[in-house]
Amino acid sequence: KRPVVASKISTMIRPYKPSDLKDCLRIFKEVGWMDGEDADKNIFEAYTRDANCLVAELDGAAEVFVVARTGSMRYLDSEIPFSGVCGVVTSHVARQRGLASKATARSIKEAALNGAAVSMLGMFDQGYYEKFGYGSTTYHRISTFDPASLQVPKLSRSPKRLTSKDAEAMHNCRCRRRRYHGGC
């Protein structure tokens, strides 16, 4: 009896190209991050603009998408370069193959080679942090307070509903804020 040999599946991790857009929109829709609407393209392009993006191909189609952004982090009185992995999205057919982990590791490696002294992961499952050697905060209470003891001044006006027209002003406000130790 001849042994059964699984077919070889071709995989490759490479930089995102505009021609990957259709595959990436499919992945985002598949996992529920997008609705498959016409506006998805614009949202995706805004999300990836000026970011470092990788895809992992499975049999010639992009099935994993990793997006990372660079910036600086305040450490004591210094600014140090960092890179943050903002998202890892994996299609259903590419799951449990290690492709997302390999693409994430490559993104982190490329950031380090390009000068990032600190690497951060966005919110992932706790096991994902541990797999890559990231520390996390403790799970025990360090301090407590009684919320009833807070004395917050009453608003003198109604809150203003912000829209996409306010995006530039909101962004400028965030850029002007004072950064403390650990701030990004």
Language-model-derived ranges and their functions:
Residues A112-A117, M123-R141:
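Conserved active-site alpha-helix within GNAT-family acetyltransferase domains
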Residues V85-T90, R95-L113:
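Conserved acetyl-CoA-binding loop-helix of GNAT-fold acetyltransferases
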Residues S136-P153:
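Flexible glycine-/small-residue-enriched beta->alpha junction loops
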Residues K8-T70, D77-G84, L150-C184:
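Short amphipathic alpha-helix that is part of the acyltransferase structural core
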Residues G71-M73, V93, Q126:
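Short coil/turn motifs at secondary-structure junctions
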Residues V4-A6:
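Acidic, Ala/Val/Gly-enriched low-complexity intrinsically disordered segments
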Residues W33-M34, S119-L121:
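Short, hydrophobic beta-strand segments that form beta-sheet elements in well-ordered domains
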